[in-house]
Amino acid sequence: MEFILVTPQAQPGVALIQLNRPKELNALNLQLMQEIRDALKALDEDDAVRVVVITGNERAFAAGADIKQMAGKTAIDMLITDQFSTWDQIRKFRKPLIGAVSGFALGGGCELAMTCDMLVASETAQFGQPEIRIGTMPGAGGTQRLTRAVGKAKAMEMVLTGEFISAWEAHRVGLVNRVVPVGQYLEEAYRLAATIAAMSPVAARLAKESVNRAFETHLDEGLHFERKNFYLTFASEDQKEGMAAFVEKRKPAFKGR
């Protein structure tokens, strides 16, 4: 049984990955995570795909890890399974990745949402890292990405209390880009994806790399990395096309080269 649905051309240049364990509120078991990893790898290599949207359903983006699968495991079991290698590979996805969130995004679901470059949330969305309530803590980026997104004070509060925050609170603290009425989250994510898909894929990939580097290094090294990627855009056909189109007052036709 497959736990995700993949539509490579849901919109021109935009692929959709939909989590598909509705009875379990899209709880993230090992198979589902491996399917996401494999789908992203295939989409990363597909030149027709420029942006990927990942979503769940109205009730839940993903309500956390599959606790039934994890409950009996020991520390040694978790080390041997090495489930986090899958998360590391998802993190390395090079194209823009947009999360479309409705309902619960909790625990591993919140961590999966935070691997996205941008998030669109329904008004019904709730975000949280409630692992402490069951005697554990975030292990797939919840302490690191959340702190980078919302700051130490809010991250510490969410991680130590296990309390959820609403879509509007997530927007206020910088976790979410856009909040939309119920039922419009996927449409808005497609709209955002279409805007990005119309840009140069070369520039988008290099720009994504550069923004992410800002959280991984000191300023001087980050500026050096940014400058290197800026120079690389001038080795692309897209840069020539983009500037020619600007001068000629027409829309550019980017090819991703």
Stretch-by-stretch model annotation:
Residues F3, K41, A48, G56-K92, ...:
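Glycine- (often His-adjacent) and acidic-residue-rich active-site loop
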Residues R91-A204, Y231-S236, E241-A244, E248-R250, ...:
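Crotonase-fold acyl-CoA enzyme core
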Residues K208-T217:
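Short, charged, surface-exposed hinge/linker loops at domain edges
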